[in-house]
């Protein structure tokens, strides 16, 4: 009989409304304010943004205005972890509404720090602890209610079938009514509420051990036999249900109104409690939900509850006949009832009763006993009497539990004065700490927090008071850690929150080492204030700031952000540049350590010296290594070049075929036979020859075995220049070179010179454009070499070559041409044959920096056929590193005529540049003139475009030839203009023009030394 009466009492009493589970929503619909958007994408809707709340992230409608962060303690973090593990093990995800509801309830207990805007300069004042206390009491009461409904659901189903139960009939009518506007998210049925409520919503206490039959799962997964209480007799159960039905039938219906106690009222709650964003300095007042469940019941309801308690007190014998399971359920229901009444009394008044003037937490139960939060004294007296009756009934129930040896449920410890204990341990074994953690310093804290809600002792004379004292003795005793507390700490448990801290042997201190030694105290304090400002923490958090040489040390006190010394050190490293810019100091080192270790920090000067020494050592080693590598590389290059030179020379010394040698010697004899025998010889031939050869790199090497003696005749240079003329020309050249302004003006005048006529229409024809290597150097129409079209492979008379006249306009002295292209090689050899040339001067390498300068128009060995001209390589002689000499055997296959051609190839002159030394080029010119002497045919001179290097060589040779013939006046600028009248672009740069003047002066000086004094 007692158990059904208790259930009816639970329905009549107005405990704090439990948070209802959200109504079933289709899985695809996005609910506002969903949690977990930082961990899973796609939770927020199109008009929502994910706001970082410090835990999982919460969706808010754009623009987001409610910015706050949860303050998560280690105990709360463990509770969240357990809840997530249970949800995951059951198969729920962040998309499920049940997961959202459970985690929202878990986060409701956590204090918050509100921000003015997302980038707030400092944290707002956290929400008052009274709000968290209010929600905690609500959860504990809700836990008891949920367990009671789960265990006694069959009794409620049986009661729903009793025709005499007017109260339950009204409950069904309330369930069948359509939902009111704004309440569509909440269930109107007790069974629906229980089906959506899980044990996961209410975490067990710290010392609770859940039995295996209470593993986390939803009620819908339980079987009917698990929901039914295990009673010994079904007859006894029917007696209990019948008695409860009869009692409910005798109870008159309560009038609707503010104090309505219908089951529908128990399940009403607002869709979302409004949370205005207040200033941190203003205490937050939380409005009550719709149909405020915290309002006390009416006087008539209190009288009926009082009568019900008396009925329960008159039937102790029947209560002693209940089973263990029923007694356990009654204990849980009474615990939840008392907690709901305690909580209702504590939260009845405005915020002034719960919050003191200093913003600290007030003692809710004491405030309730003082009557500060009850607007109606009469109602308060009824509640007090009702509370005392519940105490006496609990004492009787406690005796029954002692007789049966029943164990209290982990979720319901609360007979009158619930005692909750939280343990926070941050101890770790010494062996598990790494060296880095030891250096940083580990705060060894072992704390035990006791929170005890004290209720004032009201005088009463009922006999149940003694029984209640016995019930207190039957509560679980304190743990070993509780018993180990000092006596003073145990006596002070009633004062509120107690913290026992076991400090570490030596407190860890943070330090920041700067480049300033010694560091002034005000600079050290300013640096610490900059760190505090960076972390948005008050400067008072940093205690015991000291300056040790170049370092500043500090300790981090307790703070609401739970920032430790190691966190400060890490933030300093991450924001090093910003701190250096703000403080004007250079941060060299940061860390955490004991004060004794900080005193032995190495002086900064020694660190800098060691760093400099290491850097200098590394630089020295690198230099030594570089020198060794360079020396080895140079040696290898020289050795390989000498080896290649020896191989090439030995290859040149090998005899070619007998036919080629015999043919070449026969050609040389024919050439000597046609030479006129009566050439005059100068009187000083040998002397001038010896003086001219003094600029060579060494003694003149003898011709190779593949060369004929007739090709290298030692005919002397004819010179008619006297001493006075030579000195006058030399002084003119020296003055020209020393006067840079004069040279500059002369070159500017040459650049402005325009040749007349200067038409190049033939070179610009469509069929001739591919035959030009450079479009900047095209032959003039009036001055170009004409080929015989009938002998040309392209039947064209065009080739990019210009005849250069000296004193005789009928016989050109030179032919300046471009380097042959693959398509113009046959034209080049045709020009050589038709012009009767026997000397070719080549002034460019084949390739420069990967760019082709000239085509390889001769065979490397043997012979090649170019149209009707067969070219056979006879010899190749390397005179020095700067030039070499090749001899070719040229044959016209149409006429079977043959001719010898000698090529002088200068290797060290690059495009738009000058040779490294004029001496090598002058020696090269002497070799060319010795071979050419006595010939009336022109010399073919080519480089890449046939203008820059070719023009410089022709200018030097032409001026020196004029002086050798006894010219009294020399005008190099006028000579260059004469060359540009015949081919454009001759001598392309000022450096090339200056080089020509230098070469002429050096050769004149050599001639003067050779003349008789």
UniProtKB/Swiss-Prot annotation:
Gene3D superfamilies: Protein tyrosine phosphatase superfamily (3.90.190.10), Protein-tyrosine phosphatase receptor IA-2 ectodomain (3.30.70.2470). GO terms for cellular component: secretory granule membrane; synaptic vesicle membrane. Subject to proteolytic cleavage at multiple sites. Residues 743-1003 form the Tyrosine-protein phosphatase domain. The record marks 425-426 as: Cleavage. Substrate binds at residues 911, 943-949, 988. A motif (Leucine-based sorting signal) lies at residues 1002-1008. Its EC number is 3.1.3.-, 3.1.3.48. The active site is at residue 943. The keyword RNA-binding does not apply. Pfam families: Receptor_IA-2 (PF11548), RESP18 (PF14948), Y_phosphatase (PF00102). Plays a role in vesicle-mediated secretory processes. Required for normal accumulation of secretory vesicles in hippocampus, pituitary and pancreatic islets. Required for the accumulation of normal levels of insulin-containing vesicles and preventing their degradation. Plays a role in insulin secretion in response to glucose stimuli. Required for normal accumulation of the neurotransmitters norepinephrine, dopamine and serotonin in the brain. The tyrosine-based internalization signal is proposed to function in clathrin-mediated endocytosis and recycling. This is Receptor-type tyrosine-protein phosphatase N2.
